[in-house]
Every structure is written in structure tokens, then in C-alpha cells.
Amino acid sequence: KNNTNQGASSDYYFSEYQFQKRFDNKLTLTSGAMSSYTLVKSQLYGDHNSTNIAGYIQGDKKWNKFNITAGMRMEYFKIDSVQSKGKLFNTDLNIPFQPVFRFGATYQPMEYTFLRASYGQGYRFPSIAEKYISSAVGPLNVFPNPNLEPEYGWSAELGLKQGFKIKNFK
């Protein structure tokens, strides 16, 4: 029995479907959709529900020594009645979902040598616990933040991968 008033229970439902098609011209398309639903009953952060729905597509193309990958994901998230709002390069979009893009390329100028570059966006909607937890342990108090906003970010990379061959060891 939990007598600290910190009990919680949750139901989580998840589904995902992915489809991939390879074409003769060295093109591969991958697409899919996912959904999740969470129902939480908690003494720490109250009773809440969340919905996450996403659709995505990615293309991979190969030409001799050059490979390119580009992808896009559309992310919808809602906790109770607060839902995601689209934003692109710090510009608010009038859509209820968040577009997320990624791009990558590799080039093999010589055997065992690879140059690579990539760019990707990141997006994370706050969890139910992050928005609504309320707790105290001794002098430490944790307060809810129902106005907590999603996190947006990006990453980029340039790199060189150099392999070596010594006799039959690669």
C-alpha cells in the first residue's frame, strides 16, 4: 500500500505501421505512421491523457560513389486540450502539427574513404509528468509548470571516415 500520496497508474496504447519499397534505380522509400495514447491517474500530477500521432517518409538514393538521404516527419501531440503548434525556423505556422526534416549525404572519393554531412531537426513535446508534477520532499518542492513549451533543436555534422587495409584485414 502506498501511503505517501504518490501513487500512479497509467494505460499506454501504441501502434505503428511501416512500409518500404526498393526501386531498380537504387532508390528506397520508407514511409509509415504511428500513434500512441496514454491515460494517467496520479496523485503526483493529477489525471491527464496524451495523444501522439505521426506520419513520416524518407528517401535513400545511391549514385555510384554518392548516397543521399532526405526525410520528413509530421508530429501531432496533445495533452488534455493543449496540442502541438507547428513552427518552422522560428516562424509560427497555422497548423496543429510539427514538421521535422532531416538530410544526409555521403561521398566515397577513394576506396576506404568516406566524406559525410548531415542536418536534422529535433522536436520534443513535454511529458505529462514534466508539466504537472507537484511534490515535496523535506525542504525541496517541485511545482507544476502547465505552460511548459515544446523543445526545438537542430544538429549538423561534417565528417571523414578513413578505413585501412593491411593484407587481408580491413
What are these regions (language model features)?
Residues 91-108, 112-114, 118-170:
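Outer-membrane beta-barrel signature, preferentially recognizing the C-terminal barrel domain
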